[in-house]
Amino acid sequence: MDFNAIIKRVIGIITKPNQEWETIKTESSTIADMFTKYVLILAAIPAIAGLIGNLLIGRSVMGFTIRIPFSNALIWAIMMYVMTLVALYVTAFIIDILAPSFGSQKDLVSSMKVAVYASTASWVAGIFYIIPALAILALIAGLYGLYLMFLGIKIVKSPSQDKAVGYFVVVIIVQIILYFLIGFIVSAVAFGRGAAFM
């Protein structure tokens, strides 16, 4: 595992996204490489931070703090991690399926590049889940991730210029629905059906 390469990519995609997307576009990579050398490490940050936050601080519900039992917090963290990996595949698949409709080429590797590297800001900001009250900062980073997604689609997938925004909007709508469902399922399984609405 080359942690220097991971750190370099994280800094590049967050601070110089246009440049980094151009580099990513021309990189020879496989889906397995992206997962083993990048995703498996970074996607663990929100899950581990959330586990720690749920155990040490708990969840605030209507002004009351609820301490989460270890087994529930662990189930939540494992499911969140696994579902994040599944969501990446689904997102990449959607990006790829939609490509011809927006003047782009079907290529699952380039679609996975967009899904993976656009998620970087959210994963890194997932550290804020250690203190559940700061989870809003992870949400803000997620908004920056939308910008990264737009640039990634535009640069890596190279859709028709007049269709780039539409491509991005359709992918984001699908992603919002996907992540809402994942959050609901994970919370319902880990904390019970009523907790899915917390």
Can you describe what each PLM-predicted range is?
Residues 27, 34-35, 61, 115, ...:
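Flexible domain-boundary/linker segments
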Residues 94-178:
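Hydrophobic alpha-helical transmembrane segments and adjacent short intramembrane/lumenal linkers
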Residues 28, 39, 106, 112, ...:
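Solvent-exposed, flexible loop/coil residues
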Residues 2-103:
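Selected alpha-helical membrane-embedding segments in polytopic membrane proteins
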Residues 46-84, 122-142, 179-198:
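Membrane-helix interface segments in multi-pass membrane proteins
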